[in-house]
Design a protein with these regions (language model features):
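Bacterial N-terminal signal peptides
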Residues: 4-15
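Family-positioned intrinsically disordered, low-complexity linker/tail segments enriched in G/S/T/P
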Residues: 6, 18-140
Length: 140
């Protein structure tokens, strides 16, 4: 009887430890790429400006403290858009270009910003698209 209780306790402990694994190391990122040269007209259909089935390069940089703060992580991706100009990437799974790796980012040490750069030709001549602060997201 005592051995059965011990085995049951061990199985329950192992099951709980497997169920409580660490969250995944990555951030999903998705966007649609348009080939807009000049200004966009409000209310005009931009469907024919979508960069469908094109090879592009995307670079993600995580900055600390403010939008011009020190770079703590940088990576690049080479990907192809789909028929709607859509691409989906996971930040943390690209080609690392910084000294620190994604898993070593201390998210609790102040504000963090994500700078997104793109090269619409698939090369390394990047243009900055955005530089936005990270905000908390619940994880279950």
């Amino acid at each position: 009887m005592r051995a059965s209780i011990l085995v049951l306790f061990i199985v329950a402990t192992v099951s709980l430890s497997i169920a409580q694994q660490a969250p995944p190391q990555g951030i999903n990122y998705q966007a649609v790429v348009y080939d807009i040269e000049g200004s966009q007209m409000p209310g005009v259909d931009a469907y024919d400006l979508i960069m469908a089935n094109k090879q592009i390069s995307v670079r993600f940089t995580i900055l600390q403290s403010d939008p011009n703060g020190p770079e703590i992580y940088k990576e690049s991706h080479s990907t192809t858009t789909d028929e709607y100009g859509l691409f989906s990437l996971v930040i943390g799974q690209g080609t690392q270009q910084s000294a620190g790796d994604f898993s070593s980012i201390d998210w609790g040490s102040g504000y963090h910003f994500l700078k997104v750069d793109i090269d619409k030709t698939g090369g390394s001549n990047f243009v900055t698209l955005s530089n936005q602060q990270f905000w908390s997201v619940p994880y279950a």
